[in-house]
């Protein structure tokens, strides 16, 4: 039984009695209606015999639909009170209705078809009287494949009951239908065949979608329409429903009537308008191609998307080893990626897909892959698993970077160069000649916002251990990573001094993600590692982009179908980009609130181009292969938006055609397309009707939900349900739809409203066919299934608005290009860029005012200044205060003054994005007592003096901060000539000599402060060796490794892996025991390739560490 039968037969407990009563009624009506049609007279006596009383065993309740006197022309009726038990007077009302109606028609000379219609409507009323709630629901105009229209005058009656919408679907070219442009003139048509079928004993009119009588005549049930803002309102004609939406929900459709009346004046003179607006059309064509050029970020950005897909596939294969990740969506359909919009990924196992067993349990897959991504370092906040949607997906929202213009970026370059020159002239010269942060950038450099150090950091992974790792654990950990990614892929390995954190740098970001997801092994029981990228902003490509991950293959084939269409004409992709921006800014593209998606907008655009003959039709089933094994590439190929070989004449012709097509799109869907009877479909060439798809009757109620009520004229009940179809505001355009004005519901009405609201929230099974767009591959799927009358009228309003705006507004105020203007910046620069001849380099061109990502070195600069100020404040405090008191911190006012004095641009930009507390948190600081600033965690400052060997400083300190007396005293003790204060070391040998000369008699308590000062100098110069960590104290601890051993325990023949020494960063055996040691500023490489298995590696470790008695005790504990 369909939903429509449940709707009208709710409460029926004995279906046999109901059907028998219906058949008896139909039989008696057959005998009584024939004389009435032949003699044009009727009497109550003759019609009384046609009524059969319902069975006395089970008497269901009845509801009669009454209308007020004099309410001719109204299309909707409302419920009255429910009688306790159907009695004989109610049956007499049905008898009188038939006789009085026929008598009224005979008095005014009605035709036989009208009498048959009345007799048929009377039979419908009697047959539907047996269920619990009986409705008089005549059919509205239904879809037909033929354009002719047959209409008759509406039946008027003085009785209590009037049915003003009685139309039946008629097979063939003579069936009743109406077009979108002649809806007001469409009358009511009556099908003689359907009436005869009902007279001959056809079953109840609402029992099924398609039924036949005993004689084989076709029959279609009446079409019902519901409002999408008040789900309890039901109408039998779309005109009445549209008028209801305009009357009751006019606040949400304030501009519909005004814009439609103005736009309709263009219909008779449309060809003349196009001729007069030829210059305007050319102007919009230039603007369209300017938007297309701005969205094309080049082949390099598409390569980033390819690397992100490969990285995600490595994570997914930890869940399903044979699964592959494909890119679909706009990046495939358009062939470009702008680097900002989100990317759609889908996971498919090709073998299982061809076997028919894919996808697996999508909810479990969402949970499993989400857990794997979080283990790989993805944030819990940015990763959003959506497992209870119609299509379960995983959404990733990347953290928004700071936006910076080209002018501000070059200003930062200049200030960074000047500040580096103020610190050290030699360093400034090397920075200007070799550093990518200088203003004199090389011509082959593509990324202006990335330093060499940032690229190194993006390939680095941090492993934080819960316990300190001994030599066996560290060796096993490094070996497990090398076995997963390959020994040649590992470039550097760093361990901190406490052996609880390891950082590894790889050759590519893809290998870094692979190392983040590989299984880790340890020797000690209970040891675990938390894996995450080294830096919060410099990470592999997958971490820094928005993406959606699904598990269905429909999107792959859909995207390649759109790609085939859009790449077939040069104007197709630019126009689709403009319409996508318009749909988002106008609110038409808002699937969260039940509107359309970008996919639906693209289908509308392609359907229009095919209908106009601009592009050829492509069969979705025949021309696009279904198999993904050899026909689809996981990485979409890049295709430039603008052909660089165009001549100025060819470009002008394309611009004129693009402007005309964009203007015609709005006119076509505003006036030419028949939304009442036709469907936007690419499944077949030509026109597709709603009747051919079975979409001419909509699902109006869910199973178990209350029966919808008809409205009483003058007091219509409005139930504002905040369910799936509720209006919750427009997220894209920034405006919200006002809720309909409703009165508070109490008693029975309030109970019905709350229960209906709960049912609407529980189920989204309501499918509407007011706005029909057929999906090319998913069967019986309407992409506009959530759009009712109110949302349809809103979309039509935006079509009218866009059409009028293109004809009368200037480029700065046109609503169609509102989204493109906000994203592309200056209109003049875009127009100038689009007007010239196309060049290959213009595809990736950017306007000066276009925002780009803020370089990470801006935070490094503020971090360096804050660290220096903290060190200076600590030194001042220790010089004035006695020992034993705790350092309170640096004054916040002093820190802000230092920011304004040394980095005003960075400070201003950072404060535009974060407040004071957020910025301090990003810098690794905390506010103490509302006026002092301290590090959140001082790693390596208090423990450094106790555990670090005395006299060891990092090699990157360009100029140790010692007084002249200290320098002279150290030089005199060592017997060497003192170095000049202006001379900075340029090699490791010079730093080693400086360490020997200066640090012989230097007190150990001054070591941490001087190390911090020396480290911040490296940060200010922005050298790659100093930006390996996001926090200065973490960077300090990175080079204090415990791999140093005394010369007595280290020999030249020992394996570096076993002893922990390194040729670059180890201790030179030639140095005396008390001489200061040198640690290289460049993180040391892990020596030795590890291709052995775990058993071989264990034997190797055993052989190396068994040389001392202490190591033997460790081995007995490990292998007991």
UniProtKB/Swiss-Prot annotation:
According to UniProt, residues marked as the site described as Important for catalytic activity are 548
Q: Where is the composition biased (Basic residues)?
A: 60-70
Task: Summarize the activity regulation.
Answer: Zinc-binding is required for catalytic activity.
Consequence recorded when altering residue 775 to A: 25-fold reduction in affinity for RNA. 2-fold increase in affinity for UTP
Q: Where are the zinc fingers (C2H2-type)?
A: 222-253
* Residues bound to UTP: 330, 341-344, 555-559, 580, 584, 598-599
Which CDD domains would you find in this protein's record? NT_PAP_TUTase
**What keywords does the record list, in alphabetical order?**
Magnesium, Manganese, Metal-binding, Mitochondrion, mRNA processing, Nucleotide-binding, Nucleotidyltransferase, RNA-binding, Transferase, Transit peptide, Zinc, Zinc-finger
Phenotype for residue 390 to F: Loss of catalytic activity
Residue ranges for the region (Important for catalytic activity and RNA binding) are 750-1120
Molecular function (GO) terms for this protein are: nucleotide binding; RNA binding; RNA uridylyltransferase activity; zinc ion binding
Q: Region labeled Involved in oligomerization — which residues?
A: 800-900
Q: Which residues are noted in the entry as RNA-binding?
A: 390
**Keyword Ion transport applies:** no
* The UniProt record lists the keyword Manganese: yes
Cofactor binding note: Binds 1 Mg(2+) or Mn(2+) per subunit. The type of divalent cation used by the enzyme affects the nucleotide specificity; Mg(2+) induces predominantly uridine (U) incorporation while Mn(2+) also induces substantial incorporation of both adenine (A) and cytosine (C).
Q: Which reaction is the catalytic activity of this chain?
A: RNA(n) + UTP = RNA(n)-3'-uridine ribonucleotide + diphosphate
Q: Where in this protein would one find the motif Nucleotide recognition motif (NRM), according to its record?
A: 773-782
For bias type Basic and acidic residues, the affected ranges are: 90-103
Where are the annotated segments for Disordered? 1-156, 196-221, 1047-1076
Q: Source organism's superkingdom? A: Eukaryota
Note the subunit structure: Homotetramer. Part of a 700kDa complex. Interacts with p45 and p50 RNA ligases.
UniProt similarity note: Belongs to the DNA polymerase type-B-like family.
Query: What is known about what this protein does?
Result: Terminal uridylyltransferase which is involved in the post-transcriptional editing of mitochondrial RNA, a process involving the addition and deletion of uridine (U) nucleotides in the pre-mRNA. Specifically, catalyzes the addition of Us to the 3'-hydroxyl group of guided RNA (gRNA), with a preference for RNAs terminating in 6 Us, but also can add Us to RNAs terminating in 6 adenines (A), 6 cytosines (C), or 6 guanines (G). Can mediate RNA-independent UTP polymerization in vitro. Can mediate pyrophosphate-dependent degradation of synthetic RNA ending with U residues in vitro.
Q: What is this protein called?
A: Terminal uridylyltransferase 1
């Amino acid at each position: 039984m369909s939903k429509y039968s449940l709707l009208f037969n709710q409460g029926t407990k004995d279906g046999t009695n109901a059907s028998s009563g219906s058949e008896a009624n139909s039989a008696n009506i057959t005998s009584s209606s024939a004389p009435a049609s032949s003699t044009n007279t009727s009497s109550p006596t003759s019609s009384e015999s046609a009524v059969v009383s319902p069975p006395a065993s089970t008497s269901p309740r009845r509801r009669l639909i009454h209308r007020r006197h004099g309410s001719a022309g109204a299309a909707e009726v409302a419920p009255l009170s429910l009688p306790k038990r159907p009695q004989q007077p109610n049956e007499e009302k049905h008898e009188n209705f038939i006789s009085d109606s026929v008598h009224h028609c005979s008095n005014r000379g009605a035709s036989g078809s009208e009498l048959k219609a009345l007799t048929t409507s009377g039979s419908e009323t009697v047959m539907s009287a047996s269920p619990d709630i009986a409705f008089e629901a005549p059919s509205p105009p239904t879809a037909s494949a033929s354009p002719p229209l047959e209409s008759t005058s509406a039946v008027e009656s003085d009785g209590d009951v009037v049915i003003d919408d009685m139309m039946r679907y008629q097979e063939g070219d003579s069936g009743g239908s109406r077009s979108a442009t002649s809806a007001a003139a469409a009358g009511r048509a009556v099908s003689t065949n359907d009436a005869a079928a009902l007279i001959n004993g056809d079953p109840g009119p609402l029992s099924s979608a398609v039924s036949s009588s005993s004689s084989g005549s076709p029959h279609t049930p009446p079409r019902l329409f519901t409002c999408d803002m008040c789900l309890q309102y039901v109408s039998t004609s779309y005109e009445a429903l549209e008028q209801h939406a305009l009357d009751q929900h006019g606040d949400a459709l304030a501009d519909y009537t005004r814009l439609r009346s103005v736009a309709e004046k263009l219909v008779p003179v449309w060809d003349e308008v196009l001729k007069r607006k030829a210059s305007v059309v050319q102007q919009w064509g230039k603007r369209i191609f300017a938007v297309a050029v701005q969205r094309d970020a080049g082949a390099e950005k598409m390569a980033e998307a390819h690397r992100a897909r490969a990285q995600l596939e490595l994570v997914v294969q930890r869940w399903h080893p044979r699964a592959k990740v494909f890119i679909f969506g706009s990046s495939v359909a358009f062939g470009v990626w702008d680097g900002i919009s989100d990317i759609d990924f889908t996971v498919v196992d090709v073998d299982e897909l061809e076997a028919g067993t894919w996808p697996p349990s999508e909810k479990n897959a969402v949970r499993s892959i989400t857990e794997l991504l979080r283990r790989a370092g993805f944030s819990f906040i940015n990763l959003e698993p959506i497992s209870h949607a119609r299509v379960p997906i995983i959404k990733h929202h990347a953290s928004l970077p700071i936006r910076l213009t080209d002018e501000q970026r070059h200003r930062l370059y200049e200030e960074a160069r000047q500040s580096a020159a103020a610190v050290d002239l030699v360093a400034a010269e090397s920075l200007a000649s070799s550093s990518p942060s200088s203003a004199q950038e090389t011509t082959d450099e593509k990324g202006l916002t990335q330093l060499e150090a940032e690229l190194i950091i993006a390939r680095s992974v941090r492993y934080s251990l819960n316990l300190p790792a001994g030599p066996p654990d560290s060796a096993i950990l490094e070996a497990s990573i090398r076995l997963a990614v390959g020994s040649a892929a590992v470039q550097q390995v760093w361990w901190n001094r406490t052996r609880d954190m390891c950082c590894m740098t790889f050759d590519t970001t893809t290998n870094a993600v692979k190392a983040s997801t590989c299984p880790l092994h340890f020797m000690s029981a209970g040891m675990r590692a938390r894996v995450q990228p080294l830096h919060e902003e410099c990470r592999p490509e997958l971490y820094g982009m928005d993406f959606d991950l699904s598990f269905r293959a429909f999107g792959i084939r859909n995207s390649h179908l759109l790609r085939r269409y859009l790449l077939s004409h040069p104007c197709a992709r630019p126009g689709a980009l403009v319409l996508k921006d318009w749909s988002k800014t106008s609110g038409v593209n808002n699937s969260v609130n039940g509107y359309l998606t970008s996919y639906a907008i693209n289908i509308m655009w392609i359907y229009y181009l095919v209908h106009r003959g601009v592009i050829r039709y492509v069969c979705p089933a025949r021309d696009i292969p279904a198999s993904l094994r050899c026909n689809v590439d996981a990485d979409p190929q890049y295709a430039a938006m603008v052909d660089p070989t165009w001549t100025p004449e060819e470009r002008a012709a394309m611009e004129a055609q693009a402007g005309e097509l964009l203007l015609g799109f709005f006119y076509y869907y505003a006036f030419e397309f028949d939304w009442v009877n036709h469907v936007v479909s690419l499944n077949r060439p030509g026109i597709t009707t709603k009747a051919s798809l079975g979409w001419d009757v909509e699902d109006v109620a869910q199973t178990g939900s209350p029966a919808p009520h008809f409205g009483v004229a003058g007091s219509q009940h409005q139930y504002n349900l905040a369910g799936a179809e509720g209006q919750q505001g427009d997220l894209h355009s920034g405006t919200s739809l006002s809720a309909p004005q409703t009165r508070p519901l109490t008693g029975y009405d309030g109970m019905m409203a709350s229960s209906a609201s709960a049912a609407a929230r529980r189920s989204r099974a309501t499918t509407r066919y007011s706005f029909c767009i057929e999906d090319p591959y998913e069967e019986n799927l309407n992409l506009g299934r959530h759009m009712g009358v109110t949302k349809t009228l809103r979309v039509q309003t935006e079509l009218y608005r866009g059409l009028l705006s293109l004809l009368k507004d200037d480029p700065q105020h046109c609503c169609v290009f509102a989204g493109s203007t906000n994203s592309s910046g200056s209109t003049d620069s875009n127009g100038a860029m689009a007007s010239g001849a196309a060049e290959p380099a213009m595809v990736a061109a950017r306007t000066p005012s276009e925002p780009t990502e803020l370089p990470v070195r801006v935070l490094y600069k503020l971090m360096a200044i804050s660290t220096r100020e903290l060190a200076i404040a600590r030194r001042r405090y220790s010089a004035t205060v006695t020992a034993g008191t705790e350092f309170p911190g640096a004054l916040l006012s002093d820190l802000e003054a230092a920011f304004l004095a040394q980095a005003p641009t960075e400070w201003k930009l950072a404060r535009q994005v974060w407040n004071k507390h957020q910025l301090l948190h990003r810098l690794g600081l905390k506010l103490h007592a509302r006026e002092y600033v301290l590090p959140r965690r001082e790693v390596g400052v208090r423990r450094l003096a106790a555990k670090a060997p005395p006299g060891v400083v990092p090699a990157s300190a360009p100029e140790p901060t010692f007084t002249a007396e200290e320098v002279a005293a150290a030089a005199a003790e060592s017997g060497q000539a003192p170095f000049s204060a202006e001379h900075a070391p340029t090699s490791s040998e010079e730093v080693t000599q400086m360490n020997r000369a200066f640090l012989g008699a230097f007190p150990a308590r001054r070591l941490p402060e001087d190390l911090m000062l020396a480290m911040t100098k490296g940060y200010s110069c922005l050298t790659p060796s100093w930006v390996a960590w996001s926090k200065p104290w973490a960077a300090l601890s990175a080079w204090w490794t415990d791999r140093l051993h005394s010369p007595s325990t280290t020999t030249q023949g020992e394996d570096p892996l076993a002893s922990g020494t390194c040729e670059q960063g180890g201790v030179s055996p030639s140095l005396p025991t008390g001489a200061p040691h040198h640690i290289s500023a460049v993180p040391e490489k892990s020596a030795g390739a590890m291709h052995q298995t775990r058993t071989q590696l264990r034997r190797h470790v055993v052989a190396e560490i068994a040389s001392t008695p202490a190591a033997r005790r460790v081995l007995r504990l490990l292998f007991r």
